[in-house]
UniProtKB/Swiss-Prot annotation:
This is V-type ATP synthase beta chain. PANTHER family: V-TYPE PROTON ATPASE SUBUNIT B. It comes from Thermoanaerobacter sp. (strain X514). Produces ATP from ADP in the presence of a proton gradient across the membrane. The V-type beta chain is a regulatory subunit. It comes from the Bacteria. GO terms for biological process: proton motive force-driven plasma membrane ATP synthesis.
């Protein structure tokens, strides 16, 4: 039986205080009926004695405390899930945005998910091919990993996200692959780009999109990634699919969290963000992984824009603590016209060693990766030295390394937006680049691999 109250004390911004309530639970779903009969939804944020603080999803515009009816539903927010969600576009609360019919749910799941017993987790160890050399070759993505992309305002992270969503695949398995795409606080233009790109390339058929626009309520933005992950958990653990969850932009999510925290008059932490920002982000990122005995898996690629390109900002800083590495986009590479502008030196995939090698990619992958990384770093140093002292001060070997760095950026890092490179193509480009350097400089690659894979100069 629903409990209905007309005891609204005050409404401030997206918050409503209801008095004289009984048996109300934290996170409980709330329905608010306006004087005109319109139904709005909210969620219980806090309970103190007989008072409940309710957060409104659709905002408080037009509400009158004298004629509002508040009903506490007795359950938390749930998402109706079904395999039919593939190919559909939803808003941040799981309602159809593509003018299609409502989904007939196979079951309804709490969007906060169930915690995974750490002993039930399986270690990520299978290679996911994104078709992007800078990721596949040097910062390999592994099934069940959470690997964020740190971008900056104006950088092409939207195009990169769409490209990964189109191209990602698990090699050597017959399991189905799906993409769940959650967009938070994006513009109409960006939303149209994602939807039209997926439809044009046919990727929409294996994708579920949850889109929260910049003019949608902040509280809806907080629910969006949880809706997406609930859908992903259903597809992974009930339908045995490999699911890649791409979430953009986590900075907008954290801004919404700060906005709601300020409305609740909570004590702010660093730069005004709530003190529980780390814990809140962990409840999202830790829903990635694999479970023993289950075929499905959830791999996460959260994307965030670093305010003022600052890696020490609380959002990238805390994200880096929780996730297993980071891929950093470079403004300098972007100015050179290189797409994707992935800066491979500060980028890192902590699980890359587990997803490469014989039977996964190729036996020479680890050695080649180490050699390319070291050679590019040496080439960057040589170029910096040339700026200070002039090219005449460089040794012949340093000049070769400087040439290697330029070629590496132009041929290995750079690729077309529609270019889907196989791991064999990526490795072949890497070996071809090493022909620029003398064989004596290839100290990180075993001789048998050099004999087997290094092309002759001039081939």
């Amino acid at each position: 039986m629903l409990r209905e109250y007309k005891t609204v004390r005050e409404i401030v911004g997206p918050l409503m205080l209801v008095e004289k309530v009984e048996g109300v639970k934290y996170n409980e779903l709330v329905e608010i009926e306006t004087g005109s009969g319109e139904i709005r939804r909210g969620q219980v944020l806090e309970v103190n004695g007989d008072k409940a603080l309710v957060q409104l999803f659709e905002g408080s515009t037009g509400l009158n405390i004298n004629d509002c009816k508040v009903r506490f539903v007795g359950k938390s927010i749930e998402l109706g899930v079904s395999i039919d969600m593939l190919g559909r576009v939803f808003d941040g609360l799981g309602r159809p945005r593509d003018k299609g019919p409502m989904i007939i749910p196979e079951k309804r799941l709490d969007i906060n998910g169930n915690p995974i017993n750490p002993t039930a987790r399986d270690y990520p160890s299978e290679f996911i091919q994104t078709g992007i050399s800078a990721i596949d070759g040097l910062n390999t993505l592994v099934r069940g990993q959470k690997l964020p992309i740190f971008s900056g305002s104006g950088l092409p992270h939207a195009q990169l996200a769409a490209q990964i969503a189109r191209q990602a695949k698990v090699l050597g398995t017959d399991s189905k692959f799906a993409v769940v795409f959650a967009a938070m606080g994006i513009t109409f233009e960006e939303a149209d780009y994602f939807i039209s790109d997926f439809r044009r390339t046919g990727a929409i058929d294996r994708t579920v999109l949850f889109i929260n626009l910049a003019n949608d309520p902040a509280i809806e933005r907080i629910a969006t990634p949880r809706m997406a992950l609930t859908c992903a958990e259903f597809l992974a653990y009930e339908k045995e699919m490999h699911v890649l969850v791409i979430m953009t932009d986590m900075t907008n999510y954290c801004e919404a969290l700060r906005e709601v925290s300020a409305a609740r008059k909570e004590v702010p932490g660093r730069r005004g963000y709530p003190g529980y920002l780390y814990t809140d982000l962990a409840t999202i990122y830790e829903r990635a992984g694999r479970i023993k005995g289950r075929k499905g898996s959830i791999t996460q690629i959260p994307i965030l824009t670093m305010p003022e390109d600052d890696k020490t900002h609380p959002i990238p800083d805390l994200t880096g603590y929780i996730t297993e590495g980071q891929i950093i986009l470079s403004r300098d590479l972007y100015r050179k016209g290189i797409y994707p502008p992935i800066d491979v030196l500060p980028s890192l995939s902590r699980l890359k060693d587990k997803g490469i090698g014989q039977g996964k990619t190729r036996e020479d992958h680890a050695d080649l990766m180490n050699q390319l990384f070291a050679s590019y770093a040496r080439g960057k140093q040589a170029k910096e030295l040339a700026v200070i002292l002039g090219e005449a001060a460089l040794s012949d070997t340093d000049k070769l390394y400087a040439k290697f760095a330029d070629e590496f950026e132009a041929r290995y890092v750079a690729q077309r937006e529609d270019e889907d490179r196989s791991i064999e193509e990526t490795l072949a480009i890497g070996w071809d680049l090493l022909t620029i350097l003398p064989r004596a400089e290839l100290k990180r690659v075993r001789d048998e691999y050099i004999d087997k894979y290094l092309p002759e100069k001039g081939e």
